[in-house]
A protein has these predicted regions:
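Conserved ABC ATPase "signature" region
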Residues: 114, 118, 125-143
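A short, proline-enriched helix->beta-strand linker immediately N-terminal to the Walker B motif
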Residues: 166-170
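ABC transporter nucleotide-binding domain
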Residues: 190-279
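Conserved ABC transporter NBD signature motif
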Residues: 73-84, 89
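Helix-to-loop junction immediately C-terminal to a conserved catalytic motif
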Residues: 65
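Catalytic Walker B motif of ABC-type/P-loop ATPase nucleotide-binding domains
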Residues: 172-176
Length: 329
């Protein structure tokens, strides 16, 4: 069996936006939401698909699910065209949009699941087994007879994820699945998704602004900005690519003036604690040795940059590149 489940080759998506140019005139502007995407996703992968607002994440998901037609390029999911073979592919994919529910608003959760069973023609035994699993792992038991409109956002999101998995899809598209959820609900959703991937080999494409989702779930990350993939690889590689500095956190026995240490720069100072940045390519050992020889230390640690800082730096570089291309063009 071919291990490639999703293929995206040279895909673009443009929209025409009409803007007022005067009291009686309007101008037409072409906006490129996606500008030349190329990537593949293998069966069983959990891939984080991240980027700033307007980067093209949701547009990509809508094209992969057949909701939108690409302007140019080629898309294949399980060897099929998402638009032309949309009905057939619906049996093989599940979709959760964080800001839109697929559940029936005025019906109890249980009835929404029963409708899904009939729509997808799920065998009774498969349906019962999958429903029991979702109810147990997502703690949906007390909610089954509650109308969807009375559920909290976190409860509804758990309900949506269960609905998307009842028919055992090969691929699950999650667009902001933890948006607005509390800490407990987020943890429960993450644990469920990780278990589903491990036990069933379900392929997951996850778009999110919560980078903890990515760190805890995904072995691979794609960063998209201005409609293009600017990074595709593992979390370790992402840290290395965006890492320009590390930080020495120095806890002194008493409050002292700013530390002056060759090869570092002071970035913060609070009481007896000082933060010193140094190049990521430099070894921390000689800096630590010099600090230990010159000062009475209570504690000392080396901190790697947070993933949020790494990605923010990548977004900034993509912004500058796009501006340069626009000027040249």
């Amino acid at each position: 069996m071919d291990q490639t489940l999703i293929e995206v080759e040279g895909v673009t998506k443009s929209f025409v936006v009409r803007r007022r140019a005067g009291r009686l005139r309007r101008t037409r502007e072409v906006v490129n939401a996606v500008a030349g995407l190329d990537f593949t996703v293998r069966r069983g992968e959990m891939v984080g698909y991240i980027g700033p607002n307007g980067a093209g994440k949701s547009t990509t998901v809508k094209m992969l699910t057949g909701i939108l037609l690409p302007s140019t390029g080629r898309l294949r999911v399980a060897g099929a065209d998402p638009v032309r073979d949309r009905v057939r592919l619906a049996q093989r994919m599940g979709v959760v949009f964080g800001q839109r529910t697929t559940l029936w608003w005025d019906l109890p959760l249980r009835d929404s699941y029963e409708l899904a069973r009939r729509i997808y023609r799920i065998p009774a035994g498969t349906y019962a087994r999958n429903l029991d699993r979702c109810v147990e792992l997502l703690e949906l038991g007390p909610l089954l007879d509650v109308p969807v409109r009375q559920l909290s956002l976190g409860q509804r999101m758990r309900g949506d994820i269960a609905a998307a998995l009842l028919h055992e899809p090969e691929v699950l598209y999650l667009d902001e699945p933890t948006i607005g959820l509390d800490v407990v609900s987020k943890r429960r959703v993450r644990e469920f998704l990780a278990q589903t991937n491990a036990e069933r080999g379900t392929t997951v494409l996850l778009t999110t602004h919560d980078l903890t989702d990515i760190e805890q779930l995904c072995s691979r990350v794609m960063v998209i900005d201005h409609g293009r993939v600017v990074y595709d690889g593992g979390l370790d590689g992402l840290h290395r690519q965006g890492r320009s500095e590390r930080t020495l956190v120095v806890d002194l026995e008493r409050e002292l003036p700013p530390i002056e240490l060759h090869g570092t720069r002071l970035v913060r100072r609070e009481g007896t604690r000082q933060w010193l940045a140094f190049p990521a390519s430099a070894s921390a050992a000689p800096l630590v040795a010099e600090l230990a020889g010159r000062y009475e230390l209570r504690d000392l640690s080396v901190r790697e940059p947070e993933i949020e800082d790494v990605i923010a730096r990548m977004y900034g570089e993509a912004e500058r590149t796009a501006a340069t291309v626009a000027r040249i063009g």
